[in-house]
């Protein structure tokens, strides 16, 4: 596999990790990104994976009261930047992009990745960035929907079966040029659109977004049980 180092010599690559969320489905009192898997927190594992790419730097958007993140042993910590997160994930990402726009070029590429996805592989990261740069368009990791999907009514009865033929399940990282993504999110927020990921903001301004095949083991830790699954995945990948 061709690696990125020669391709990105002209193009700087940054990462944004929104990590201000409370993750209410995980726990009312604990933050999932700060749970431990083996001897490191989830977010340290996540940064370690992203740091396999030739990043110029990465920005962690954290809660205003968060004093813990800066004490962690992040990979390439000299490349770490911190900014305040926002109310929702989308606001955290925008805050990080505003921070980045002071130190980066608007044509630099930025990967936005969930803090709670520590199992993304280098192969997936490499393929995603390579595809974005070679086609000069935004891109996301995603996997085709495998299961049969049912649309139900309010009584929890099946209305119909939804064709899954063209349906993909979005993952992260999602990559775009800093200036384009910043404009997309600002425009979407101004128009009161619901933004669930970076791609939905990009779609809303007519920006084409490429889907790059991900892996089913790139799980997002959402519930307490997922920690053990992530541990097993990391163990098997190593």
From Swiss-Prot:
It is an enzyme of class 2 (transferase). Gene3D superfamilies: Spore Coat Polysaccharide Biosynthesis Protein SpsA, Chain A. SUPFAM superfamilies: Nucleotide-diphospho-sugar transferases (SSF53448). It holds the Pfam family IspD. It comes from Acinetobacter baumannii (strain ACICU). InterPro entries: IspD, IspD/TarI, IspD/TarI_cytidylyltransf_bact, ISPD_synthase_CS, Nucleotide-diphossugar_trans. Belongs to the IspD/TarI cytidylyltransferase family. IspD subfamily. This is 2-C-methyl-D-erythritol 4-phosphate cytidylyltransferase. It catalyses: 2-C-methyl-D-erythritol 4-phosphate + CTP + H(+) = 4-CDP-2-C-methyl-D-erythritol + diphosphate. The record marks 164, 220 as: Positions MEP for the nucleophilic attack. Pathway: Isoprenoid biosynthesis; isopentenyl diphosphate biosynthesis via DXP pathway; isopentenyl diphosphate from 1-deoxy-D-xylulose 5-phosphate: step 2/6. Its EC number is 2.7.7.60. The keyword Nucleotidyltransferase applies.
């Amino acid at each position: 596999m061709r690696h990125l180092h020669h391709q990105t010599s002209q193009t700087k690559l940054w990462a944004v990790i929104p990590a201000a969320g409370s993750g209410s489905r995980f726990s009312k009192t604990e933050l999932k990104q700060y749970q431990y898997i083996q001897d490191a927190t989830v977010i340290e594992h996540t940064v370690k994976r992203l740091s396999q790419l030739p990043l110029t730097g990465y920005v962690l958007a954290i809660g205003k009261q968060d004093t813990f993140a800066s004490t962690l042993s992040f990979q390439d910590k000299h490349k770490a930047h911190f900014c305040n997160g926002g109310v929702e994930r989308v606001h955290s990402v925008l805050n990080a992009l505003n921070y980045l726009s002071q130190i980066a070029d608007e044509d630099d590429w930025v990967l936005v990745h969930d803090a709670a996805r520590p199992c993304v592989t280098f192969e997936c990261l490499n393929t995603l960035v390579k595809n974005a740069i070679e086609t000069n368009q935004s891109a996301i990791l995603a996997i085709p929907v495998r299961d049969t999907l049912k649309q139900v009514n309010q009584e929890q009865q099946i209305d119909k079966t939804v064709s899954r033929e063209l349906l993909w399940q979005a993952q992260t990282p999602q990559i775009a040029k800093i200036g384009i993504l910043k404009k997309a999110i600002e425009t979407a927020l101004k128009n009161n659109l619901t933004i669930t990921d970076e791609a939905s903001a990009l779609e809303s301004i007519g920006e084409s977004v490429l889907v790059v095949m991900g892996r089913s083991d790139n799980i997002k830790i959402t519930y307490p049980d997922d920690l053990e699954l992530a541990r097993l995945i990391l163990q098997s990948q190593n």
